[in-house]
């Protein structure tokens, strides 16, 4: 599947309506758009949150099989009320939609508690680097989340995931991985890297 976002230098932001329409028209594999109104922190004001509600509704009603969100409150905890509202909007429009909580988790307080809150809210997946700069550095927390909490929501390692380390992350018990599949921050997706990653995953 593809996580679709704009604003790559900012860590990903909500793609435009035109890009969403194009994705529906031309992409044959599952596409999960990100809903994030701006770069920076993950605590949003009322106007930003209102735009997120509208974007979640739009994406869910367009027929995308999943989407990606993440909100923290001013204290640095998962914003349970706002996340619950967004999940409710998405699943009212599409009851089977899969919802991933993105790397806002890596800035959250008390990661075990945060993970348990995401499970209670009903998130499908968690994208995380284990609260470290990259997934290999955060492998201890990733492993703990997977093994101690039944991998529900599914823990998806992300952050500098490459063909030469993906096997180590899969060995932790991960059933999903996330990679930009680029050779540098200034280049686009590299098909060869995608192929190598896919081969590693399918070999498990």
Predicted region positions:
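Hydrophobic faces of well-ordered beta-strands that scaffold small-molecule active sites
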Residues: 2-4, 31-35, 67-69, 99-103, ...
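Glycine/small-residue-rich loop that forms an oxyanion/phosphate-binding "nest" at active or ligand-binding sites
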Residues: 16-83
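C-terminal helical cap(s) of enzyme catalytic domains, especially alpha/beta-barrels
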Residues: 16, 20, 140-148, 170, ...
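Catalytic cores of alpha/beta
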Residues: 43-58, 106-121, 145-157, 161-179
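Glycine-rich phosphate-binding active-site loops on the catalytic face of alpha/beta enzymes
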Residues: 1-12, 58-75, 123-136, 172-193
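Hydrophobic, well-structured mid-protein blocks that either form specific transmembrane helices
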Residues: 60-113
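Charged helix-capping and loop-helix junction motifs
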Residues: 15-21, 46-54, 79-87, 111-117, ...
